[in-house]
Amino acid sequence: VKIGKALGTEVTVLSTSEQKRKDAERLGAFDFALTSQPETFIRLQRRFDFILDTVSAPHNYNDYVNLLKTDGTMILVGVPDKPTLLEPFPLILHRRRIAGSVIGGIRETQEMLDFCAIHHIESDIEVIPIQQVNEAYERVIKGDVRFRFVIDLGSLR
């Protein structure tokens, strides 16, 4: 959200959880929509030039492809553990693209870090002492994590 806003785009956060709305607003999102509500996919049809899909849980890619404008692109960075079916007709008819990315190389990562430094973009993290690593792991399993955990190695003493 922060990078998209710094690039001058209108970022919409799509989420299954209403609990993420406040974070989306705080981060500067232009809009927020619940994907757990079927009307969202009707209201947002053909609205986006670009979708960055970070979801690792199985979900219907076709619903999201239909949110793309003609010539829109969806980049997949989440890796669901099950295959998914994809309808080719909406891709072909509207010249939409789907691509994937694991991570950038050293050059791309440095460009991103430089961009973030120029625009004063910082990561949202939760710092935990090493003694709480097991609790943090349990929270990850339960889906009770808002941001990345960072272990304070100073707590090893």
Where does each model-flagged region fall?
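Conserved SAM-binding loop of SAM-dependent methyltransferases across substrates and taxa
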Residues: 2
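Short glycine-rich anion-binding loops that position phosphate/pyrophosphate groups of nucleotides
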Residues: 57-58, 80-81, 156
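Rossmann-fold dehydrogenase core element
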Residues: 73-75, 86-126
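C-terminal hydrophobic helical "lid"/dimerization subdomain
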Residues: 6, 62, 106-157
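Well-formed, non-transmembrane alpha-helical positions, independent of function
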Residues: 23, 63-66, 90-91, 115, ...
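Helix-to-beta-strand junctions that scaffold the AdoMet/dcAdoMet cofactor pocket
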Residues: 68-70
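Adenosine-nucleotide cofactor-binding segment
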Residues: 5-63
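Residues in the short beta-alpha loop(s) of Rossmann-like NAD(P)-binding domains
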Residues: 17, 80, 104
